Amino acid sequence: MYAIIMTGGKQYRVSEGDTLRVEKLPAEVGEKVVLDKVLAVGEGADLKVGNPYVEGAKVTASVQAQDKAPKIIVFKYKPKKNYRRKQGHRQPYTQLQIEKIEIQ
């Protein structure tokens, strides 16, 4: 069984036991989170699509880690004008372990 969920403005295809990184969620490590924005649920050839969400469907996950992604460098410059700006950014994320996909 798989589900397509939406969190942090992005969509993910998940199955039970999957590990995925999503945009930072306000939860502690080890805590359970319920993702109720389920766009579709499928098993084999059977697919149930929501409008926009599937009624009574929810995905339960546990928080494995709260961390930051590797640093990216943002560098702006204007040639011949001695204008240079260097900035780094590390995007925070939450790592989830999918435990259960339920549909009623």
UniProtKB/Swiss-Prot annotation:
Keywords: Ribonucleoprotein, Ribosomal protein, RNA-binding, rRNA-binding. GO terms for cellular component: cytoplasm; ribonucleoprotein complex; ribosome. Belongs to the bacterial ribosomal protein bL21 family. PROSITE patterns: RIBOSOMAL_L21. GO terms for molecular function: rRNA binding; structural constituent of ribosome. Pfam families: Ribosomal_L21p. The gene is rplU. Part of the 50S ribosomal subunit. Contacts protein L20. This protein binds to 23S rRNA in the presence of protein L20. PANTHER family: 50S RIBOSOMAL PROTEIN L21, LARGE RIBOSOMAL SUBUNIT PROTEIN BL21M. InterPro entries: bL21-like, bL21-like_sf, Ribosomal_bL21, Ribosomal_bL21_CS. This is Large ribosomal subunit protein bL21. One of its GO terms (biological process) is translation.
